[in-house]
């Protein structure tokens, strides 16, 4: 977009973290908001592939990327595979804020955004993995444009500290060793327990919000 002499345009779900808004202000890219219908709820609802397809088809200016938060702050997990298919059919990249979903890669069947077709996503490892606060992973799909890797390194150099916390780095390495061990088996067991608890709560008449594993 910059090479064409225009500001990049990102279509973003309105329930994004405020840091996305700060990034738009700092990097001077334009944003068009994607707001799902409330469907009688006061809570945020998921962006569906049908809604995204309609929004992209009706857009006066095609965005360069779509930005989705999944899981969201209420535990809703979007249909990333469906959203990725829609984005790529329209010639648009898909970026996912997977801050609360670092563990999704280690379920019996991976639900991680990269495995489901996203072009780029970030995991806040410290939120759902045994990592010190501030530890995170940036994932770039092998199917993403070739310049992504180089641009990511440049951006990290621009915004990252030259004095990183080696405590955080070591905690990421320790977590990687944990993930390579029996973590997937323990996660599968916990997911089964969580599902059973949801069913029991629903049976007692509680409205259980979110479909996160």
What does each model-found stretch correspond to?
Residues 1-210:
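Conserved PLP-enzyme active-site core in the AAT-like
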Residues 213:
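Conserved PLP-binding active-site segment of the aspartate aminotransferase-like
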């Amino acid at each position: 977009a910059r090479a064409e002499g225009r500001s990049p345009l990102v279509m973003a779900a309105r329930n994004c973290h405020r840091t996305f808004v700060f990034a738009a202000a700092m990097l001077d890219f334009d944003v068009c908001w994607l707001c799902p219908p409330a469907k009688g709820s006061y809570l945020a609802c998921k962006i569906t592939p049908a809604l995204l397809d309609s929004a992209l088809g009706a857009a006066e200016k095609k965005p360069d990327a779509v930005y989705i938060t999944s899981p969201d702050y209420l535990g809703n997990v979007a249909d990333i595979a469906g959203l990725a298919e829609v984005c790529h059919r329209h010639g648009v990249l898909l970026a996912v804020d997977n801050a609360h979903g670092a563990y999704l890669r280690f379920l019996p069947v991976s639900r991680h955004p990269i495995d489901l077709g996203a072009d780029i996503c970030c995991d806040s490892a410290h939120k759902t993995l045994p990592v010190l606060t501030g530890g995170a992973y940036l994932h770039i799909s092998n199917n993403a444009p070739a310049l992504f890797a180089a641009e990511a390194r440049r951006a990290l150099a621009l915004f990252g500290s030259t004095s990183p916390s080696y405590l955080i780095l070591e905690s990421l390495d320790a977590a990687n060793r944990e993930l390579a061990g029996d973590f997937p088996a323990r996660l599968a067991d916990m997911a089964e327990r969580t599902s059973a608890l949801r069913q029991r709560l629903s049976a007692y008449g509680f409205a259980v919000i979110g479909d996160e594993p």
